[in-house]
């Protein structure tokens, strides 16, 4: 039985004797349970249904109380399939919310919404557990300092820097490199910040969850030989799960991240893929509970639900949780209530471009569409701000000239525009970077580029000092010194060929 690990076993047995209810009604994943007078469970309490099916199959379903209906009835949402449940079955009130394992024992493992390992690697140490429902940190505990979270990825740090303890939206279609970018961030936070990551797979395809796990093992983010040295914990509630599980799996991942922040005092990266599915699951549960739908059929509690998740993702004086959330935009409609509610909480957006991916420029982050509230002179400094603006202006001018180049060719441009195009093409290539996690696929070693080095490199390109170098010298290199070295090698090679 999945008892609440925070309660000792004698208490559980008395709870089982005292607080037993019975199923009165089952509608899909929603159960109505009748309790004796005066023994009603609290909202968000975990209920456990145990028993046997008619064919003798063992049943163990955990539910969460969502509504108190009156007449000693509560309405609960199941966290797993309700097949085989019948009216009259006994329901145990655990007396506390769902609790999940936290701490170092979670690293390198895959969990479901209940905090149970699903990777067939044996049980997890459950001595340290934490309830998934908690209030956000008090205002006095928050760290109000606006500081940049250096990722070591040039295009991100220069043009759309992440805020330490901020929330970032990751926009991109299939096959443009979201997973590789996520894995590189997990790798870099572990190496540069000594931090850990938690990945919450919310309502996405099970194939994607499996692929991510395999790629993490291949790239060393999950260390198979020594699980304790892994840098990430995975929590999955995929498309095949009932809406209750998909709605709560984000909170399970967040609870694990909060422990690393508050107790271990670490910098944590929390990935949520996909935040839209969290809203979608909430909408399904809301309809099942009989609530009147609001705008576009979404739940009336949309803003509150989103807020209760997002407000727990923050920096405190102990550590920080920086969250990167993949955002699916239904029918590409940015005004849809789900993405619109998400945007209100984001500090930065990283947009991946299929055009750049097709050119082979990875990471395929669009330098013009990606934005950040941190890119202000008073936060990043005048030098960083000026360099970023000039890079954007040069890229924008190149974009405007592309139609003319396609029709008339480069020769028809003015001298000034030709120079702008040459520098913009160098910038475009210099924004690419070899990743540590892609080493196994590309064969070229990964590079972590500090912010100072990044700014220096782009200043040299913009100043015209490197106008004589071929543009391919800037492709897939780390800092600017590597680009000049690569240019010399290319020159030597071309002389040898002649």
UniProtKB/Swiss-Prot annotation:
Subunit structure: F-type ATPases have 2 components, CF(1) - the catalytic core - and CF(0) - the membrane proton channel. CF(1) has five subunits: alpha(3), beta(3), gamma(1), delta(1), epsilon(1). CF(0) has four main subunits: a(1), b(1), b'(1) and c(9-12).
Stated name of the protein: ATP synthase subunit beta, chloroplastic
Any Pfam family: ATP-synt_VA_C
Keywords: ATP synthesis, ATP-binding, CF(1), Chloroplast, Hydrogen ion transport, Ion transport, Membrane, Nucleotide-binding, Plastid, Thylakoid, Translocase, Transport
GO term, biological process aspect, one: proton motive force-driven mitochondrial ATP synthesis
CDD domains listed in its UniProt record: ATP-synt_F1_beta_C, ATP-synt_F1_beta_N, F1-ATPase_beta_CD
Coiled coil: none
Family (UniProt): Belongs to the ATPase alpha/beta chains family.
MF annotations from Gene Ontology: ATP binding; ATP hydrolysis activity; proton-transporting ATP synthase activity, rotational mechanism
Topology in the lipid bilayer: Peripheral membrane protein
GO-annotated cellular components: chloroplast thylakoid membrane; mitochondrion; proton-transporting ATP synthase complex
Annotated SMART domains: AAA (SM00382)
Function comment: Produces ATP from ADP in the presence of a proton gradient across the membrane. The catalytic sites are hosted primarily by the beta subunits.
Localization per Swiss-Prot or TrEMBL: Plastid, Chloroplast thylakoid membrane
Entries under PROSITE patterns matching the protein: ATPASE_ALPHA_BETA
Reactions that this protein is recorded to catalyse: ATP + H2O + 4 H(+)(in) = ADP + phosphate + 5 H(+)(out)
Enzyme class label: translocase
Record keyword Cell membrane present: no
Enzyme Commission number(s) from the entry: 7.1.2.2
Positions bound to ATP: 172-179
Entry keyword annotation includes Ion transport: yes
């Amino acid at each position: 039985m999945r008892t609440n690990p925070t309660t000792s076993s004698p208490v559980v047995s008395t709870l089982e004797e005292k607080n037993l209810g019975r199923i009165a009604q089952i509608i899909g994943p929603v159960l109505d349970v009748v309790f004796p007078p005066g023994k009603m469970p609290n909202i968000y309490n975990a209920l456990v249904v145990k028993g046997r099916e008619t064919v003798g199959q063992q049943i163990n379903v955990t539910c969460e109380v969502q509504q108190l209906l009156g007449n000693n009835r509560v309405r609960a949402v199941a966290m797993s399939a309700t097949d085989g449940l019948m009216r009259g079955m006994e329901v145990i009130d655990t007396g506390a919310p769902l609790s999940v394992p936290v701490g170092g024992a979670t690293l390198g493992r895959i969990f479901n919404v209940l905090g149970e390992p699903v990777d067939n690697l044996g049980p997890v140490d459950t001595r340290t557990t934490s309830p998934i429902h908690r209030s956000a940190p008090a205002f006095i505990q928050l760290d109000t300092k606006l500081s940049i979270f250096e990722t070591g990825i040039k295009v991100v740090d220069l043009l759309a820097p992440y805020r330490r303890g901020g929330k970032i939206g990751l926009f991109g279609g299939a096959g443009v490199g979201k997973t590789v970018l996520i894995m590189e961030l997990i790798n870099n936070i572990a190496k540069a910040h000594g931090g850990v990551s938690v990945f919450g797979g919310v309502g996405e395809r099970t194939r994607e969850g499996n692929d991510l796990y395999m790629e993490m093992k291949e790239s060393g983010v999950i260390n198979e030989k020594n699980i304790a040295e892994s840098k990430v914990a995975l929590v999955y509630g995929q498309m095949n799960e009932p809406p209750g599980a998909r709605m709560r799996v984000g909170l399970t991942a967040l609870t694990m991240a909060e422990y690393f922040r508050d107790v271990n005092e670490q910098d944590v990266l929390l990935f949520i893929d996909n935040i839209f599915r969290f809203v979608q699951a909430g909408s399904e549960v809301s309809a099942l509970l009989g609530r009147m739908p609001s705008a576009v059929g979404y739940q009336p509690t949309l803003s509150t639900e989103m807020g209760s998740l997002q407000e727990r993702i923050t920096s405190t004086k102990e550590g920080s949780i920086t969250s990167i959330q993949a955002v699916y935009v239904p029918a590409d409609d940015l005004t849809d209530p789900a993405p619109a509610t998400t945007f209100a909480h984001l500090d930065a957006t990283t947009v991946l471009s299929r055009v750049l991916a097709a050119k082979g420029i990875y990471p395929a982050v669009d330098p013009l569409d990606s934005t950040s509230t941190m890119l202000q002179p008073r936060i990043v400094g005048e030098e960083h701000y000026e360099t970023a603006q000039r890079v954007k202006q040069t890229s924008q001018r190149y974009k405007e000239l592309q139609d003319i180049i396609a029709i008339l060719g480069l020769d028809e441009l003015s001298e000034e525009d030709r120079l702008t195009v040459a520098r913009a093409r160098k910038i475009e290539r210099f924004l690419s970077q070899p990743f540590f996690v892609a080493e196994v696929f590309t064969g070229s070693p990964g590079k972590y580029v500090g912010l100072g080095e990044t700014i220096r490199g782009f200043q040299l390109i913009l100043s015209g000092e490197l106008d004589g170098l071929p543009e391919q010298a800037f492709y897939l290199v780390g800092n600017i010194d590597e680009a000049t070295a690569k240019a010399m090698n290319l020159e030597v090679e071309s002389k040898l060929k002649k």
